[in-house]
Curated annotation (Swiss-Prot):
It comes from the Eukaryota. SUPFAM superfamilies: alpha/beta-Hydrolases. It is found in: Cytoplasm, Cytosol. Its EC number is 3.1.2.-, 3.1.2.2. This is Acyl-coenzyme A thioesterase 1. Pfam families: BAAT_C, Bile_Hydr_Trans. The active site is at residues 232, 326, 360. Gene3D superfamilies: Acyl-CoA thioester hydrolase/BAAT N-terminal domain, alpha/beta hydrolase. Pathway: Lipid metabolism; fatty acid metabolism. One of its GO terms (cellular component) is cytosol. The gene is ACOT1. Monomer. PANTHER family: ACYL-COENZYME A THIOESTERASE 1-RELATED (PTHR10824:SF16), ACYL-COENZYME A THIOESTERASE-RELATED (PTHR10824).
Amino acid sequence: MAATLILEPAGRCCWDEPVRIAVRGLAPEQPVTLRASLRDEKGALFQAHARYRADTLGELDLERAPALGGSFAGLEPMGLLWALEPEKPLVRLVKRDVRTPLAVELEVLDGHDPDPGRLLCRVRHERYFLPPGVRREPVRAGRVRGTLFLPPEPGPFPGIVDMFGTGGGLLEYRASLLAGKGFAVMALAYYNYEDLPKTMETLHLEYFEEAVNYLLSHPEVKGPGVGLLGISKGGELCLSMASFLKGITAAVVINGSVANVGGTLRYKGETLPPVGVNRNRIKVTKDGYADIVDVLNSPLEGPDQKSFIPVERAESTFLFLVGQDDHNWKSEFYANEACKRLQAHGRRKPQIICYPETGHYIEPPYFPLCRASLHALVGSPIIWGGEPRAHAMAQVDAWKQLQTFFHKHLGGHEGTIPSKV
């Protein structure tokens, strides 16, 4: 009997869904190596492997069988995905076109490392980013540039503005996945995209206000307010938007700063200068990468206090998702300082969830940890922090937490789209 790889759901599923991996038709207690590989849109290769042993019936189920070593060890049913590593260093797995899936090739090889033997079976597994029926609508309204994703069922839906960080451009994959959970989500670009400013030297909150108003006026978005979701600089912008703008009910800040960073922020007659930077505080790792965690000045001292975002003006509810091993900046410190400022002014205490051994890029589930890559503002490779397994577990939990938070504070019902298509 030939060995067969069995996936459930078979064939394809949404990127944020777990897949059950099993092998049948092996010899009793046969040692095998499972290998996963994936190429991103630019052709960069990511790989992971793990050693296993079949049971007495010649079967192997990754939900029951621990990995004996390789890219990971122990009972990790999704390890072959979250443990993927780039063949070349400094490559972060990013999905730029959500209309096409990423294909993972899974292989079963006879024996164990260092030299597993012949290929026993292989299967191609597609993971898509546009859930079935989710509608994708490019947005060019006034100055606003982005993409709106709407669930398949009739609206209106709770609305969310979704923003990424200093890489600029427009990333849609988090918004498209979240639309599959019953939200109307607009991925918003704010610089280095189409006719938007090329740099972050000066950002005007009026632009973001226009985006919020666009979403609130959309016939398939229910008010009276919207949610904000942002990571890194995008998380910091969520704090600024909630502090200065009307129409914001709830905000999720993933590893954001409580100080304005990287450029001047303007709104009407007010200006927030960027917090000061001291490049002498850059450390260098043994791999030669920069560790910039101490580079920014404290927004609690001296002239840098002017960069502190006036969160006490915000009327929205906050959820801070914090990686305690974030090496981009001091995310836990920032979340705690925002909490202190809010409570000192009688505002509602925010929810803060801290994840140990978790780095800067807390992504949707099953994205592999990016250990280091080029930082757009620093101009050289930096480390982002995190340990692969802990970071992977944090991503699964954070994804659930932010959905629960938005459903609670924006209303709506928890919708999920069946995975089988």
